UniProtKB/Swiss-Prot annotation:
Catalyzed reactions per annotation: UDP-N-acetyl-alpha-D-muramoyl-L-alanine + D-glutamate + ATP = UDP-N-acetyl-alpha-D-muramoyl-L-alanyl-D-glutamate + ADP + phosphate + H(+)
Species the sequence originates in: Methylobacillus flagellatus (strain ATCC 51484 / DSM 6875 / VKM B-1610 / KT)
GO biological process, one term: peptidoglycan biosynthetic process
Protein family according to the UniProt entry: Belongs to the MurCDEF family.
Listed InterPro entries: Mur-like_cat_sf, Mur_ligase_C, Mur_ligase_C_dom_sf, Mur_ligase_cen, MurD
Biological classification of the source: Bacteria, Pseudomonadati, Pseudomonadota, Betaproteobacteria, Nitrosomonadales
Protein name (database record): UDP-N-acetylmuramoylalanine--D-glutamate ligase
Length: 453
């Protein structure tokens, strides 16, 4: 357990996580300083107001900022590989994140369910939270979704449901979740990790001292994380592997969520579209087994869940063409899941900041499902190179608004237009939510134009 009173703590990175950590550390009696590589980081005014006199180091990290630190608390956006961080580690200075501080401070009676993965983690985290709330548990959903973890520590909480990114897990050592999952691994953040193995290793840290591992039977990376001597359950889109595992069973042409050979509910009863969401529902059920929740209550919570914004979310129908917003699809794996999940002919809008990904995995699903692809953003050309042999028409849009009009004109009646960029948004937009807002407005404007035509 870290002793924080009177300890000199350097917080790296402002923004929501950094500000949350500063406030929490101040309450523990730590002596504080902060460093951020940006000249004007978000939260700077609030920090200056709340912590007058505290040393604030802005711009490229220097040895002087790190010199007196006895503990470093790194925000997720700061890589552990940063040279000054590495130099501090070599001097024996511990480097942790806010999730590690949470792990050491949380009440022992509260359960922790932890979720990570390249795709689906926000949906599964929210589903688990909804199931726990429906079962009457005082539940907090936090981490990479919602509030920072240090803002929600409360002795009255029964269950913490945490969405955790690979960045957060890099500096987490003792979470000891009651149940944890790595939903899947696909190329993402390759601008931060040396290779897929390094990315997977960061994700696998979620299983450190976990009570139950929930593994994706359909994902070789997740499956390969099974640890000896730890309880495991699997989920997947094939029949369950054992009487305790989760999967799909088929009866008279209808797919059912199942545990072992027991049919639980028809997939068609879910309000969230696509087989990837059936997998998400199965993962949520598997994670909740550590809480001994009444199955009827859990299944009703699944039925009631309407989905999250910007995850293959229906926007409008215009002249027989359905528009879907999957702006949260910021990597190749998410877009592949969306294409298979909608499982209909469509025009795909993709592109943005590719984060060093290999887009080759898009080729086969695009060839199967797409009538055309309209590419936008900085890495449009990189994606075009990867899709050249798909046999699908490739077009370009200088703006997202232009791409929406082009996609509509390329679509046939009965098709969909899917915004699923497979890329980050910051080359053209403030964030993925802003990208979604621009898309929805472009669709709405198109709808008005078609109605008045």
């Amino acid at each position: 357990m870290l002793q924080l009173k009177d300890k000199q703590v350097l917080v790296l990175g402002l923004g929501d996580t950094g500000l949350s950590a500063l406030r929490w550390l101040a309450r523990q009696g730590a002596r504080l300083s902060v460093a951020d590589s940006r000249a004007l980081p978000p939260g700077l005014d609030a920090v200056r107001q709340e912590f007058p006199g505290m040393a604030i180091h802005l711009g490229p990290f220097t040895a002087a900022a790190f010199k007196e630190a006895e503990l470093i608390v790194a925000s997720p956006g700061v890589p552990v590989a940063e040279p000054q961080v590495q130099a501090a580690i070599e001097r024996g200075v511990p480097v942790v994140g806010d999730v590690e501080l949470f792990a050491q401070a949380r009440s022992a009676h509260a359960k922790v369910i932890a979720i990570t993965g390249a795709n689906g983690k926000s949906t599964v985290t929210t589903l688990v939270g909804e199931i726990c709330k429906a079962a009457g548990f005082k539940t907090v959903v936090a981490g990479n979704i919602g509030l920072p973890v240090l803002d929600v520590i409360n002795d009255a909480v029964d269950v913490y449901v945490l969405e955790l990114s690979s960045f957060q897990l890099e500096t987490t050592y003792s979470l000891a979740a009651d149940a944890a999952t790595v939903l899947n691994i696909s190329a993402d953040h390759m601008d931060r990790y040396a290779d897929m193995q390094a990315y997977a290793n960061a994700k696998a840290r979620i299983f450190t001292r976990a009570g139950l591992q929930v593994l994706n039977a359909d994902d070789a990376w997740s499956r390969g994380m099974a640890a000896e001597g730890v309880a495991q359950l699997t989920f997947g889109l094939d029949a369950p592997r054992s009487a305790q595992d989760f999967g799909l069973l088929h009866d008279a042409g209808e797919a059912w969520l199942a545990r072992g050979q027991r049919k639980l509910m028809p997939v068609a009863d879910l309000n969230i579209t696509g087989l990837h969401n059936a997998a998400n529902a199965l993962a949520a059920l598997a994670l909740c087994t550590v809480l001994d929740i009444d199955e009827v209550v859990a299944l009703q919570a699944l039925r009631d869940f309407k989905g999250l914004p910007h995850r293959v979310q229906w926007v409008a129908d215009i002249d027989g063409v359905s528009f879907y917003d999957d702006s949260k699809g910021t990597n190749v794996g998410a877009t592949v899941a969306a294409l298979h999940g909608l499982n209909r002919k469509l025009v795909l809008i993709a592109g943005g900041d590719g984060k060093g990904q290999d887009f080759a995995a898009l080729r086969a699903p695009v060839a199967k499902h797409a009538r055309a692809v309209v590419l936008i953003g900085r890495d449009a050309g990189v994606i075009a190179d990867a899709l050249q042999e798909s046999g699908v028409l490739l077009e370009y849009g200088d703006t997202l608004e232009e791409a929406v009009v082009k996609a509509f004109n390329l679509a046939d009646r009965g098709d969909a237009v899917l915004l699923s960029p497979a890329c980050a948004s910051l080359d053209m937009f403030r964030n993925y939510v802003h990208r979604a807002e621009v898309f929805v407005k472009a669709v709405t404007d198109l709808q008005k134009k078609e109605v008045s035509a």
